[in-house]
Design a protein with these regions (language model features):
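Single conserved hydrophobic/aromatic residue that forms the stacking wall/gate
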Residues: 2-13
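Conserved mixed alpha/beta core segments that line enzyme active sites in large multi-domain catalysts
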Residues: 11-198
Length: 198
């Protein structure tokens, strides 16, 4: 952990000019697999890591775009709940608590698309997502960025042994013993506005 703090993220701080855990100039991270063989879509990824109730305000102020900041936050809470806290539905028959909440708010607001939700709607999504996490896991959503990071790193390592990754390796003759690395990178945003994409 000390190496990640000092060497790994220390270099990212210098390059990006931002600080992980800062409420005014937050560095947000993506945490993803770095497997030896490409396994598209098989391994878990967490984006926008480092956001909490303070950092989201800093991101809104820094970018001048509150909607973008809160959209990033609600996406992160949902992704973290799915991947790290094991709330992802295991089958098509399982209810997705996050999608249920999104559908309920869209119905309340009489809109069809996520893009039609306002900043206040996205704030409400975050509140309801956190309540769903508490209800389903018995734990609060972690607000400490370092706790978020360790949870995400462990989850990506664990995803090497998820069912879809095991099946993909069998079909493509990829040895299980190769294992995976975990890449921790500064975020590049695809949802900042009309000029950004993924």
């Amino acid at each position: 952990r000390d190496l990640v703090r000092s060497r790994g993220l220390g270099d990212v701080y210098k390059r990006q000019g931002m600080e992980f855990g800062s409420s005014s100039n937050p560095l947000l991270l993506s945490v993803r697999s770095g497997a030896r063989a490409s396994m598209p879509g098989m391994m878990d990824t967490i984006l926008n890591l480092g956001l909490n109730d303070e950092a989201v305000e800093g991101l809104a102020k820094k970018t001048g775009n509150a909607r973008f900041a809160w959209d990033s936050y609600r996406r992160f809470v949902q992704m973290y709940g799915d991947v790290v806290l094991d709330m992802k539905p295991q089958s098509k028959e399982d209810v997705d608590p996050f999608e249920e909440i999104i559908d309920a708010i869209k119905e309340e607001k009489k809109v069809k698309n996520d893009t039609e939700l306002t900043t206040d709607d996205l704030k409400e999504l975050v509140v309801r997502f956190k309540a769903a996490i508490k209800k389903n896991t018995g734990k609060d959503f972690p607000t400490n960025p370092w706790e978020q990071l360790w949870g995400a790193i462990c989850a990506v390592f664990s995803s090497w042994m998820n069912e879809r990754a095991i099946l993909y390796r069998k079909l493509n003759n990829i040895p299980a013993e190769w294992g995976t690395a975990v890449n921790v990178q500064a975020m590049v945003f695809g949802n900042m506005g009309e000029t950004s994409a993924t």
